[in-house]
UniProtKB/Swiss-Prot annotation:
Alphabetized Gene3D superfamilies for the sequence: Classic Zinc Finger, Potassium Channel Kv1.1, Chain A
Family assignment from sequence similarity: Belongs to the krueppel C2H2-type zinc-finger protein family.
Residues making up the signal peptide according to the UniProt record: none
PROSITE patterns reported in the protein's UniProt record: BTB (PS50097), ZINC_FINGER_C2H2_1 (PS00028), ZINC_FINGER_C2H2_2 (PS50157)
Positions bearing Phosphoserine: S202
Pfam families: BTB, zf-C2H2
CDD domains assigned: BTB_POZ_ZBTB22_BING1
Protein name: Zinc finger and BTB domain-containing protein 22
Residue spans crossing the bilayer: none
Localisation per UniProt entry: Nucleus
Length: 634
């Protein structure tokens, strides 16, 4: 190896590149990771500066007349809504709903570049709306959390004010230890809380349809208020219940004050009902709209399959959450309480008696082993069960014939009744007069009510469960109504499901048959067939006496009777010859007495032999209108 050359000063000079030793190779498995954490924020900050200066912006957003420019790449990465608009649809100008506040949207747009969001407490709902429309869920979650915290602080403030500075009506001494507060203070606090609750709940909020949080709010405020005003006078039953007479510190009753607090807490309740004063019960405050008689819905505690009365309010507060999903609904008709022997009515005055009939209870949540069956809005009579008693009942199989199968003793049959279009049950009562006549030989007398004829809308629809008998006649060949097992909500019964479905279409005003020429719609197929004759111009019915043609069969029948009568009385008439085309005369079975005013024998004797023709189908003329013309006799 040659020594490196020396400089005039004696220092070694660097070797040329070609003479430098090669660098040591790095191991093949070695990977060098270098991180630049400030690049991300610097990149977004640079993009935000370009947005503010209007540089390289390729999309515009309009909100209530204001236009904002931005980068489509940033919008697509920050919002699923913008991702669909700019990538899937390729839009360069986007108009947002007018429900959004332009100022709130401008702040949210800036947060997509900076990651920071500043908002006033009064504008949280506006930002929640913007986040919901743009599907920016991190903003929705944060606004929801802020609203929940604000509501909790407002609840604490109202509870403290109600417990310390409330004036009892009629007493001159304030109930709290503080100064005297006017009674309007409570009303203003209540209205303030109501307005805050209504403002903080927007349709786009994630907890807008969350009744549980509203329940927690109402329960906590009621419990705190009751603890401060009454002490230990609180009873829980799906929610706190205040006793009506409560004596304040000054000796005067504060019942009015407690009722006002109950109204305040009911505004955010779960909608299950209001508290009945003095009874400790809840009564429903909402009934679903329906064209049928309204029913009262009362939540009761699950009592298994036992028909004995059950308490209306859960007694154990620790089991309230478990029993909340095991509710039953008691349905009571107002105008049918006298007719139902086992019907019940919830006492408003707080009486201990509340007679509950198992036939009036419909299950909302079935046991896990039973499940909920698919219920048709028009149920057949084989779904009916007995109203009273628990003996085995035979049903009808799918083919319509009776089968000797019976219900299991552990699961008595549930009384399923016909439903109207809104899902309300139509009550069907057994006929007491026909129960004794339709009883089969050897049948116990106690089951007459469940095997008798069922009165539906004034018609008798035979026996519903006696093997081998329909309508009380052995052998299953009784009256014609015995085989009509398909019921409509209006009370009519049909022997075939297709007939019932066609009848239901009449109720629903469905017109499935369209005319291909004029687009008119018809409910029945034969109506369309008759209507098509008006487009073809065919007149298939021709009088055999005067050779006059008719389009409609009923018009032809009326004319034929009058024409034949005139021909018999006058003895003159144009009788068609052998070459005259004749239309279809009616069959012999339709030439019954009443046509022409006389009997059938007189008509045959008076009519000339040449005018009595054998019935033949009408002639068919083809018309080029896109469909085959025709339309013979029905």
């Amino acid at each position: 190896m040659e020594p490196s050359p020396l400089s005039p000063s004696g220092a070694a000079l660097p070797l040329p590149l070609s003479l430098a030793p090669p660098p040591l190779p790095l191991p093949a498995a070695a990977v060098v990771h270098v991180s630049f954490p400030e690049v991300t924020s610097a990149l977004l900050e640079s993009l935000n500066q370009q947005r503010l200066q209007g540089q390289l912006c390729d999309v515009s957003i309009r909100v209530q007349g204001r236009e904002f420019r931005a980068h489509r790449a940033v919008l697509a990465a920050s919002s699923p809504y913008f991702h669909d608009q700019v990538l899937l649809k390729g839009m360069t100008s986007i108009s947002l709903p007018s429900v959004m506040d332009p100022g709130a949207f401008e702040t949210v747009l800036a947060s997509a570049y900076t990651g920071r969001l500043s908002m006033a407490a009064a504008d949280i709902v506006n930002f929640l709306t913007v986040g919901s429309v743009l599907q920016m869920w991190h903003i929705v979650d944060k606004c929801t959390e802020l609203l929940r915290e604000g509501r909790a602080s407002a609840t604490t403030t109202i509870t403290t004010a109600a417990a310390t500075s409330v004036t009892v009506p009629g007493a001159g001494v304030p109930s709290g230890s503080g100064g005297t507060v006017a009674p309007a203070t409570m009303g203003s606090a209540r209205s303030h809380a109501s307005s805050r609750a209504s403002e903080n709940q927007s349709p786009s909020s994630s907890n807008y349809f969350s009744p549980r949080e509203s329940t927690d709010f109402s329960s906590s405020s009621q419990e705190a208020f009751a603890a401060s005003a009454v002490g230990s006078g609180e009873r829980r039953g799906g929610g706190p219940v205040f006793p009506a007479p409560v004596v304040g510190s000054g000796g005067a009753t504060s019942g009015k004050l407690l009722l006002e607090a109950d109204e305040l807490c009911d505004d955010g309740g779960d909608g299950r009902g209001a508290v009945v004063p003095g009874a400790g019960l809840r009564r429903p405050t909402y009934t679903p709209p329906s064209i049928m008689p309204q029913k009262h819905w009362v939540y009761v505690k699950r009592g298994g399959n036992c028909p004995a009365p059950t308490p209306l309010v859960p007694q154990d507060p620790d089991l309230e959450e478990e029993e909340e999903e095991e509710d039953l609904v008691l349905t009571c008709e107002d105008d049918e309480d006298e007719e139902l022997g086992g019907s019940s009515r919830v006492p408003v005055g707080g009486g201990p008696e509340a007679t509950l009939s198992i036939s009036d209870v419909r299950t909302l949540s079935e046991p896990p082993d039973k499940g909920e069956e698919q219920v048709n809005f028009c149920e057949s009579s084989n779904d009916f069960g007995p109203y009273e008693g628990g003996g085995p009942v035979a049903g009808l199989d799918d083919s319509g014939g009776p089968t000797p199968s019976s219900y299991a003793p552990s699961h008595p049959p549930r009384p399923l009744l016909p439903l109207d279009m809104q899902g309300n049950q139509i009550l069907v009562f057994p006929s007491s007069s026909s129960s004794s006549s339709s009883q089969a030989p050897g049948q116990p007398p106690g089951n007459q009510a469940e095997h008798g004829a069922v009165t539906v809308g004034g018609t008798s629809v035979g026996s519903l469960g006696v093997p081998g008998s329909v309508g009380g006649v052995p052998g299953g060949t009784g009256s014609g109504d015995g085989n009509k097992i398909f019921l409509c909500h209006c009370g009519k019964a049909f022997s075939h499901k297709s007939m019932r479905d066609r009848h239901v279409n009449m109720h629903l005003n469905l017109r499935p048959f369209d005319c291909p020429v004029c687009n008119k719609k018809f409910k029945m197929k034969h109506h369309l067939t008759e209507h098509m004759k008006t487009h073809t111009g065919l007149k298939p019915y021709e009088c055999g006496v005067c050779a006059k043609k008719f389009m409609w069969r009923d018009s032809f029948m009326r004319h034929r009777g009058h024409c034949e009568r005139r021909h018999r009385l006058g003895g003159v008439g144009a009788v068609p010859g052998p070459g005259t085309p004749t239309g279809p005369s009616l069959p012999s079975k339709r030439e019954s007495p009443g046509v022409g005013g006389g009997s059938g024998d007189e008509a045959s004797a008076a009519t000339p032999p040449s005018s009595r023709r054998v019935w033949s189908p009408p002639r068919v003329h083809k018309v080029e209108m896109g469909f085959g013309g025709g339309g013979g006799a029905n």
